[in-house]
Amino acid sequence: MFHEASQSVMPLIRRHLPPDEKRSDSRTKCSMEHWREQFRCSSFGLEHPQPHLFTQFEWGWPKVYLCWRAVAAVYHVAVIIVTGFCDRYSWTRTEKDSVKWFIYLTNWMFFQLTLSTLADFMALGYCHLVRKDIISGGIQRMPLFLKVTWVLHNLSNTGSILVTILFWGFVHSPGKAVSNVDFITHTGNTTYVILNLCIAASPVRFLHFFQPLTVAATYSIFSA
């Protein structure tokens, strides 16, 4: 009798076990398998067997993650508008000066970061409204819109950290006062990037280094 009862219960228990693709989430980022995957040729691409990782925190909570993405998007849009007005009325003296906003690396990188947060929020909202199968882990192939957000992540994360290093290491003079705009665009940007990297489940691949390098080369050519 006990054997029959156990057989009838086991299927119910198995239904509640996570699928195989979710079990690999428990693999730590310090494991040998993780580092092997980092340097496989396939890691140059944008395919990933767990698209649901792009829709949640490290510990899950996809709905709260949507709120986080909304706050990040609103904050960065507000900041880029405010900093634009501050630049317009603080150092520009002619219409030609106002156009120069677009030639500065800081402004480009912050605009890129803002675009990334907006794309994240829209992609995640689409997943919650239309593609709930992605959030639940029901698919194992990356949709195009998540690939786009992944590229924007790579570009904005690297660009923000680079701008912070260049400003504080080579541009800013010790003892000189720092404006609110400079502090937000050269410190707040990297603070957000590091925080987001720590709490978001979105994977990072070292072999995606060529993406920000391509943008850097393009900027150098056109600003030379």
Provide a role label for each language-model segment.
Residues F2-A224:
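Aromatic-rich, lipid-facing transmembrane alpha helices and their immediate juxtamembrane interface loops
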